[in-house]
């Protein structure tokens, strides 16, 4: 939440994305934040909005210009037909675990961790924070390097076939053995 008078963010929050065991999308969060989430479905898109009324802030925070809310983690059990994740909740990182998908696009203003996932194609459109590939297989990885922070790949446990890289005004260090082939797209 941002207004000229106040900047509110989620402190230490993680959106954990994992495969759905029931074949449908399920979203869960802590009870204390559930009353302030508004969800709407627009076509094939689930939009989740954190709407905390600033007039209900505890008295000790009413004069604070900056405030981190500690609301706990959120989880999305994702069905196979989901093609993209967009998350712009300020300071909420995303962790992907045990996903097996043909393709997925990710856009976030925060950090991403990919662990034990298999993708035929993964596109990181934007990540304002770090991108950390811990383990898994990605046949084709598409990056816009200028739209992300640091990139890290555990070369012992994460196998990347081809990286398709594009950037403007980017400074990202690529690791030796990070992928089999790298294609630069100016």
State where each predicted segment sits.
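Start-of-domain marker
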Residues: 1-44
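Extended, compositionally simple hydrophobic/Ser/Thr-rich segments
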Residues: 6-18, 71-186
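Membrane-embedded segments
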Residues: 26-71, 81
């Amino acid at each position: 939440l941002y207004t000229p008078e106040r900047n509110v963010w989620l402190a230490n929050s993680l959106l954990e994305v994992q495969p759905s065991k029931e074949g449908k999308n399920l979203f869960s969060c802590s009870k204390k934040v559930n009353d302030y989430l508004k969800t709407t479905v627009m076509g094939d898109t689930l939009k989740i909005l954190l709407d905390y009324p600033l007039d209900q802030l505890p008295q000790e925070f009413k004069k604070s210009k900056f405030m981190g809310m500690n609301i706990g983690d959120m989880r999305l059990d994702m069905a196979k037909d989901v093609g993209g994740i967009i998350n712009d909740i300020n300071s909420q990182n995303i962790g992907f675990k045990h996903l097996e998908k043909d393709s997925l696009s990710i856009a976030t203003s925060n950090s991403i961790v990919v662990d034990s996932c298999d993708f035929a194609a993964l596109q990181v459109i934007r990540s304002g924070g770090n991108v950390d590939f811990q383990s898994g297989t990605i046949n084709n990885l598409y990056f816009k390097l200028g739209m992300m922070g640091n990139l890290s790949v555990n070369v012992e446990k994460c196998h990347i076939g081809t990286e398709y890289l594009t950037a403007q005004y980017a400074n990202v260090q690529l690791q030796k053995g990070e992928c089999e082939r790298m294609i630069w797209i100016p």
